[in-house]
Amino acid sequence: MNSVDVIVIGAGASGLIAAGIAAQQGKSVLLIEKKTRPAIKLSITGKGRCNVTNSADIHEFIEKFGNNGKFLYSSFSNFFNADTINFFEELGVSCKLERGGRYFPESNDAHDIVNALIKFAKNNNVKIITNSEVVNFVCENKKIKSIVLKNGNTYSAEKFILATGGKSYPLTGSTGDGYKLAKSLGHTIIKPQPALVPLVSSDEYLKQLNKLKLKNIEISVLEDNKIATKLFGEIEFTIFGLTGPLILTVSSKIFSLLEEKKSVEISINLKPALDDKQLDDRIIRELNSFGSMPVRNMLKTLLPIQIIEPFMKKNNIKHTEICSAINKEKERKFLTV
């Protein structure tokens, strides 16, 4: 049986850093990964760019995490966003600040983050083994003594770190193994729920908006027709629904509301800088300005091209209809695309 001081299960970002830090303290460390290489999911996160951290203060971080955010105060007091940036700077990866307080590697390549973490672990003499799935713990007197791999090999250690991640992306190795392993040790597992995920909608017109990106817009999540939360930023339409930074942020909230059998809608404000009166005044000005020209021409000043056709169909506006023929009732509908 092979024996080390520390065994880390899972070679994602957390596992690589935990293994490297433990090794820096003089410990012999074995890092075990079931996939063919470390940090597969990290290499594709942020559309391949890797959103490393955010510039928000600690209170906003805690708030965004949800109901159990206070659990993170202790960890964040020891290692927070500035520490993260400094950590990667020391590893040779410079980061840049973008809209929304998001930090990305200057290269816009998540592989730079992955390679830096692997190098960090290896430079500190961490032994990494891949294609090795942990299937069981061996315990004596309520203490873990060793782990058993799927191939039958066993490894013992004084300390064990479970860093398997969640179950968000099975192809990358995130299949929920950690829940099963923790449960086998007697831990109670709270039912996981989706977070940071796209949303699926049955609205047929969304298919016409596939790949449309909207920036500097505001979305409102409506709970039983009442605003539950508002966010400013960007979204993207897909063939199945919605995605993008704002959608990923509110997805956990929406799932919780749906679990409570609430009625949930998303409202998108394309002109958040204008209140209803200002927007109404602008629409009237545009209609008057375009006069005998087709409504479609006027709409190009207000809406992305891809939205115009679905909008006209929804509001029964004919292609031949001219601006001067739009009555007040139809004009008011322009406020709620």
Please report, for each region that a protein language model flagged, where it lies by residue.
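Short hydrophobic core segments
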Residues: 7-9, 32, 134, 147, ...
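Glycine-rich FAD pyrophosphate-binding loop
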Residues: 7, 23-47
